[in-house]
Amino acid sequence: MLGQSIRRFTTSVVRRSHYEEGPGKNLPFSVENKWRLLLMMTVYFGSGFAAPFFIVRHQLLKK
């Protein structure tokens, strides 16, 4: 009895909730401004690419 009422409650909550739909609405960042998106992606991927080079430089200069 209790399980059925809990199941009915959770399905009604899910049914009543509404999320924005459309391209880019389910992402954790905004895709509205293409230049800001370009800058953020460049920083994100550029830092991952540059990190090994900076680590090697640091190790070579360390003595």
Swiss-Prot record:
Pfam families: COX7C (PF02935). One of its GO terms (cellular component) is respiratory chain complex IV. Keywords: Acetylation, Membrane, Mitochondrion, Mitochondrion inner membrane, Transit peptide, Transmembrane, Transmembrane helix. The keyword NADP does not apply. Residues 17-33 are mitochondrial matrix. Component of the cytochrome c oxidase (complex IV, CIV), a multisubunit enzyme composed of 14 subunits. The complex is composed of a catalytic core of 3 subunits MT-CO1, MT-CO2 and MT-CO3, encoded in the mitochondrial DNA, and 11 supernumerary subunits COX4I, COX5A, COX5B, COX6A, COX6B, COX6C, COX7A, COX7B, COX7C, COX8 and NDUFA4, which are encoded in the nuclear genome. SUPFAM superfamilies: Mitochondrial cytochrome c oxidase subunit VIIc (aka VIIIa). Its main location: mitochondrion. Belongs to the cytochrome c oxidase VIIc family. It comes from the Eukaryota. It is found in: Mitochondrion inner membrane. Component of the cytochrome c oxidase, the last enzyme in the mitochondrial electron transport chain which drives oxidative phosphorylation. The respiratory chain contains 3 multisubunit complexes succinate dehydrogenase (complex II, CII), ubiquinol-cytochrome c oxidoreductase (cytochrome b-c1 complex, complex III, CIII) and cytochrome c oxidase (complex IV, CIV), that cooperate to transfer electrons derived from NADH and succinate to molecular oxygen, creating an electrochemical gradient over the inner membrane that drives transmembrane transport and the ATP synthase. This is Cytochrome c oxidase subunit 7C, mitochondrial. It is a single-pass membrane protein. InterPro entries: COX7C/Cox8, COX7C/Cox8_sf. Residues 61-63 are mitochondrial intermembrane.
